[in-house]
Amino acid sequence: MRHRKSGRQLNRNSSHRQAMFRNMASSLVRHEIIKTTVAKAKELRRVVEPLITLAKSDSVANRRLAFARTRDAEVVGKLFTELGPRYQERPGGYTRILKCGLRAGDKAPMAYIELVGRPEAAQAVDVEAAE
């Protein structure tokens, strides 16, 4: 029985899942919008939202925590210099999921996950092609 077990397995072992969400979180912070499956997008929210909340208060300890979770210095810099100040007054809900139909190969439901209030110039990056 899987009572009280949170999170999705996504047919991966735990280290693969952790690496995948670490990479997807870095891509989302870097590009501010990515295209992925609906299930991965919903699970990615649980990774990215706490990172942005952490970035709202800039300190060395918080930067080290963010680096431990993303392992990307460029992403940590953007989190604390751009995204933290941008969402200073917003109490959560930093991401938006927009469903965009089915994938051509296997009919998997696809979605864009984007940061709310992003500049309109940012273009979507297809995460499936990057993997």
Swiss-Prot record:
The keyword Ribosomal protein applies. InterPro entries: Ribosomal_bL17 (IPR000456), Ribosomal_bL17_CS (IPR047859), Ribosomal_bL17_sf (IPR036373). GO terms for cellular component: cytosolic large ribosomal subunit. GO terms for molecular function: structural constituent of ribosome. GO terms for biological process: translation. Keywords: Ribonucleoprotein, Ribosomal protein. Gene3D superfamilies: Ribosomal protein L17 (3.90.1030.10). Belongs to the bacterial ribosomal protein bL17 family. Part of the 50S ribosomal subunit. Contacts protein L32. NCBIfam families: L17. This is Large ribosomal subunit protein bL17. The gene is rplQ.
